[in-house]
A protein has these predicted regions:
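Low-complexity, serine/threonine/proline-enriched polar segments
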Residues: 1-8, 43-142, 146-153
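Short, conserved catalytic/metal-binding motifs centered on acidic residues
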Residues: 20-23, 151, 200, 228
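Short, flexible loop/turn elements at secondary-structure junctions
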Residues: 24-26, 154, 231
Length: 238
């Protein structure tokens, strides 16, 4: 992990501001804070943990969303002059102020108002809070924190390879799971992941009006244009 974040440190050298929204992992925290230490101190890098309830059923997610909406509406009724974004900002600021320090690292978790179906009970912890931001700026940074892009990437990988699909649960089999398409030789999974990684970074171009232009390799300056599979297989330069 440290090598990965060190590589990112070099790639992001010309980037003005860097924000990391990380899954809750102590190794990832240490690697990120170590590799970007100077930029964190200099005020050009921030890191946040993002935590969501991953094991809820659809009905449970809907119930939690209804509860969160009711709480939001009650809070909004005390601030009739604000629109939804203004109420959300005020609510986050209040929750930041009342957050309690937890654990040996004194993490202060803040539950976000109006979480979506994809991120139920979303909570955010600012890992690099040096007291440099005003309350409004800090609240909007909390509001931006999300793992949605990461989850979308994982789902895309699962759809591309049957080996990586989620296991199937059966009520008739006492809740046991069945990995229908699992590889008999685990090393095959690593090979598939390498192929998907190359295609994602160099070949597949995002679609849609809001999609970023080019491939990740093009946006990072590692390639001049999207490649084809033939370019990669036969080592053609771009």
């Amino acid at each position: 992990l440290h090598g990965y974040f060190t590589a990112l440190r070099k790639m992001f050298a010309s980037v003005g501001k860097v924000r990391f929204f990380l899954d809750q992992d102590s190794g990832m925290r240490g690697a990120c804070l170590s590799a970007f230490r100077d930029r964190i101190i200099g005020g050009t890098c921030d890191a946040f943990f993002v935590r969501i309830a991953k094991d809820l059923t659809i009905d449970e997610k809907r119930r939690r969303m209804r509860d969160a909406k009711a709480e939001f509406d009650l809070y909004a009724s005390t601030m009739p002059g604000l629109d939804e974004d203004g109420v959300r900002l005020a609510m986050i600021k209040d929750r930041i102020q009342s957050a309690q320090s937890i654990g040996p690292w004194k993490d202060r978790w803040v539950f976000m108002p109006l979480p979506g179906m994809s991120e139920p009970e979303k909570a955010v912890c600012h890992l690099t809070d040096l007291g440099r931001y005003d309350p409004d700026h800090l609240a909007w940074l909390y509001n931006k924190a999300s793992l949605h892009a990461v989850d979308s990437f994982f789902n895309r990988i699962r759809r591309r390879s049957s080996m990586l699909e989620r296991p199937v649960s059966s009520s008739a089999n006492r809740g046991r799971v069945w990995n229908q398409s699992s590889a008999y030789r685990p090393e095959q999974v690593a090979k598939i992941q390498n192929i998907i990684r190359a295609c994602h970074n160099y070949v597949w171009v995002p679609e849609g009006k809001k999609a970023e232009r080019g491939t990740p390799a093009v946006r990072l300056g590692l390639a001049k244009a999207p490649l084809t599979l033939e370019d990669i297989i036969y080592f053609k330069s771009s």
